[in-house]
Amino acid sequence: MRRHWITRSLTTAAVLTFSFCLTTQFVPAQAVDESRLRHSGDGGKVPEPGGKDAGGPAPRLADGTPNLGRTEIGKGAWLPKLYTDYSSLLVDPPKSQGVPFQPWAKALQEYRHKATSESEDPASFCIPLAGSHPYTRGGVHPIEFIQLPEQKRILQLMEFPGHNWRDIFLDGRSHPSKQELEEYPTFMGHSIGHWEGATLVVDTVGFNEGTWIDKEGHPHTSQLHVIEKLARTSMNNLHIEATFEDPGAYTRPWTIAFDLAWGPDWAIKEYICQSNNRYQDYYVKTTKGATGTGNAGAEFGHGHPAKGTFLGEWGPNGGTQDRLMVLMDWDGKAITGTINPGPQAMPITKAELNPENWTLHLEGGASGAGAARVVLDGKFENLTWLARSLTGTYTQGNQRGTFKITRQY
């Protein structure tokens, strides 16, 4: 199967008004000052994960179930540790083999790692952290588990990025049908769990594609399936293993392992992510029609550069749909970049946006008669800052087909 991606960038400022929400003067949504450390309790004096300070045996509930949260008379919370790149936590395959990427997923992760900053991180838009990402974000925003035996479920509470939670159902239910998961994917997915001795096993599916697996930008598709194993090995330590299975992005499942420390004096405080998110103050606004050719093109207002990643599929009418990745760059003045439908990158030679009906026309390829070319004609949909996509038709030589790509925050 062929894989297609755009290796550099293209972007339109008018679309940015709704669909990119990016800024030049970026302040990370998770930024806090030292007073936040003091306010949260013990000022960061927390046992090192997996360290010698066990703090005693792991507590249990009245029915003997391992207690992942506070004791009845105590307080405290788990503190995420900063594990930037999950490849450093690999246990299967070995670290020497690396994460088993598919080519398009590796290209996207490398782009996010080398060419981007926090301005593309979904968490910078107050988007929830999915899978095991909340445990490895670092910082001073704790996590709590609220066990509700009478309801046969566990609530996982996360202070960052903005009072998120997820339900872990322990009542023996199955996941929703594949059709329902495809129709209503979510940021956190659908989680069911069970106990294997002292280990909580959590099975999660039904993710949308709007999150990163880790802070380094490991991508995933809606096929992502995560198995987490959580074991409180002592009062002060939580051991976590997470297995990621995603045949749309990786060639095989891969597993990481790490530990979190218990902060005995910590608790979740009010943290309103949106109040510290500056993106919406710096939307790029259109002052002229977005028409340009190569580097000479499209003059737009305010001159704010922006980046964005679109993922989706394209393929011939009635044929197999292949993965399409579009990495977009808007330098504040022009739509630039390349279109790469094969091994050779095609520079953008023409870009036209009609802001009245939100259509975008892109042409790429070498100049001259008979040169290989690709043409994309699309229309933007879902014009909100949380969900937006570009759907349309393409022409490549004698081949014609359709495509749909969605902005990945």
Tell where the protein language model's regions lie, with residue ranges.
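PEST-like low-complexity, intrinsically disordered acidic/proline/serine-rich tracts
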Residues: F26-M325, G332-M346, P355-T359, E363-G370, ...
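Bacterial N-terminal signal peptides
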Residues: T11-T24
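N-terminal secretory signal peptides that target proteins for export/translocation
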Residues: M1-R8
